[in-house]
Amino acid sequence: VTWNGWGLGLLVCYDVEFPETVRALALAGADAVLVPTANMLPYDHVPRVLVPARAWENQVYVAYANWCGTEGSLTYGGLSCVAGPAGAVVRAGRDPELLVAELDRSALAVSRRANPYLADRRPDLYG
């Protein structure tokens, strides 16, 4: 979907943990991928490692909004973040808080020129 000139993609929770989901959205024109989630402990590697990697390898912003707190026997990890196409990350903590990030279209262009992963793909080799 396009909003104010930005291509937006939407994934839900676990979907962001698969490289091909973000790649498909990037190839379809997404500039930013929005991910509402309720990820539990001990899966901190998702916001700390996978979300920034998905942003960088696809040259998009990824906004990962995770639930935090405890419900029954489950503790949700928080660590919501916005990862940029060059690896910069703004991160929230374990407690509820508002995370605000300004997305810079020129940063997308710079990053896409420096790391042309989408253009350098070789789908003929892997299907």
Predicted regions and their residues:
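Active-site beta-loop-alpha substructure in enzyme catalytic cores
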Residues: 1-58, 62-64
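C-terminal beta-strand edge segments of enzyme domains
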Residues: 67-127
